[in-house]
Amino acid sequence: MQYLGIDLSNTDANLLFVSDGREQKLSLRTELCRDKREDRWYIDAEAYEKALAGRGSMVQGLLAESERDGLLVAEDTEYRAVELLARFLKLARKQVLGDEKAEELRTVIVLPDYRLAFVRELAALLPQFGFPAERTRLVSREESFLAFISAEPALLAAGEVGLFDLAEKSLCFYMA
C-alpha cells in the first residue's frame, strides 16, 4: 500500500510519501510558474529558474485565494485559484513519486482551515487532476492531530502528546 500526506499552508506544502516501509519527505513552496511560450506549469526549483530567466510568470497565494474563491493571473490570463491549487497538488505528487506507479495510492491533504464550500469544490476538482475521490481525503489540521493521538493510546495515557503549529501569523500548541 502507498500513502501520500500533504500538509498545506499558504506558503508551503510538506509531503510525506510512504511505500513498502520506505519514506520520502519533501517540502515545497506553494507556488506555480507558467511558461510564457507553452502551456506548461512548474513548481519548486524549475519554477524559480523559469521566472528568473524571464520565461515564466509566478503565481503565489494559492491556498488563501482558493479559500476566498479568488482569481489569480498568470501571463495575462485569469485562472480560478482552486484550479491552480489542484494543478499544484498534481505536480507536487509527481515530484515526490517520480516514476513510481501510484495505482493504490491513498492521499490525505491537510488544510489549516476547513471551510466546507472550499473543501467540496477542491474535492470535486481533484479527480480531474489524478486524485481518485475514493482514495483522497481532505481533513483539517485539528482532525489530523486527533487521528494521530487516537492511534497512540499509550502516549495519550501518559500525557506525552503535543503539537506545535507554526503558521504565517500564529503559533498554536495542542496538548492531549
What residue ranges belong to the model's regions?
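Early-domain small/polar-rich strand-loop-helix modules and first-structured segments
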Residues: 1-71, 127, 135-147
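A short acidic Gly-Thr/Ser loop motif
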Residues: 6-12, 157-172, 176
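Phosphate/oxyanion-binding active-site loops and adjacent basic polyanion-contact surfaces
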Residues: 58, 78-89, 118
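Short hinge/gating elements
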Residues: 68-79, 105-107
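Phosphate/ATP-binding catalytic cores across multiple sugar-kinase/actin-like superfamilies
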Residues: 84-100, 145-152
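Short helix-terminating capping/connector loops at secondary-structure junctions
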Residues: 100-104, 132-133, 156-157
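Short glycine-rich phosphate-binding loop at a beta-alpha junction
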Residues: 101-113
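Conserved helicase motor "Helicase C" RecA-like lobe of SF1/SF2 P-loop NTPases
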Residues: 120-122
